[in-house]
Amino acid sequence: RNRAGAPLNPIANLRLAEGEAMVHQMRALIAANLSLYEADDSQTSTTDRMVSYNTLKVSASALVIRVTEIALRICGIQGYMEDGEFYLSRHIRDAHSAMVMVNDDRILGSLSSVVLGMPITRDV
C-alpha cells in the first residue's frame, strides 16, 4: 500500500482476483466429475460420463493456461528471470503441454460427433 492507503498495483489485484476465480472454477469442475465418478447412478449413461470427463480435460487445460498467463501479467518480466523467486517459465511450458500432449482438438473432434448424436434430455 502507498502512503494514502491505496493498493500499490490495483490492476495486479484485479488479475489476482481473476486468477482466483478461475482456480475455483477448475476445482468445481473437478469436484463435479469426482462426484460423477463416485456416484452409483444408473441414470447417468456411459456416454454422459465420457462427455463429462473429456470436457473436464479440455476445460482444465484451457484454464491452467489462462491462470499461468495471469500470473505472468502479475509478476511482469520477473516471471522470466530464472534466478528470481517469481520464475514462471516452467509453469507456462507445462501448462501449454497439457493442451498438446493429449491433443484437445482431437478430444473435441471426438466429442462433437458423440454430442451431436445425443438426445437433449440432460440438465444444462
Q: How would you name each of these model-derived features?
A:
Residues A17-H24, N54, V58-I65, R93:
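Generic structural signal for well-ordered, non-transmembrane alpha-helical segments
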